[in-house]
Amino acid sequence: MDISKMNRYTAPVNFASLPLLTTFLCGVGLLLLATFTMIQVTSTKYNRNLLKELFIAATSSVFLGFGSVFLLLWVGIYV
């Protein structure tokens, strides 16, 4: 297996777009986290909706997770 004959790996995301992706994904994740927190603080035990809370929490966690990955790539920690 000759390494000089192998194709060079190119990243699926352009490095110039990492700051924008990080800012957008973390911003949306934090906005959803704030929404989830406000729902928890202002709702009573009679008007809570479990599916809505789970959906907002899961969506926030996905956005913050991908935002964190792109933040690590942006600062040079290649995961």
Swiss-Prot record:
GO cellular component labels: cytoplasm; endoplasmic reticulum membrane; membrane; oligosaccharyltransferase complex
InterPro entries: TMEM258/Ost5
Top-level taxon in the UniProt lineage: Eukaryota
Regions that span the bilayer: 19-39, 55-75
UniProt keywords, alphabetically: Membrane, Transmembrane, Transmembrane helix
Function: Subunit of the oligosaccharyl transferase (OST) complex that catalyzes the initial transfer of a defined glycan (Glc(3)Man(9)GlcNAc(2) in eukaryotes) from the lipid carrier dolichol-pyrophosphate to an asparagine residue within an Asn-X-Ser/Thr consensus motif in nascent polypeptide chains, the first step in protein N-glycosylation. N-glycosylation occurs cotranslationally and the complex associates with the Sec61 complex at the channel-forming translocon complex that mediates protein translocation across the endoplasmic reticulum (ER). All subunits are required for a maximal enzyme activity.
Entry similarity comment: Belongs to the OST5 family.
Protein name: Dolichyl-diphosphooligosaccharide--protein glycosyltransferase subunit TMEM258
Native organism: Caenorhabditis elegans
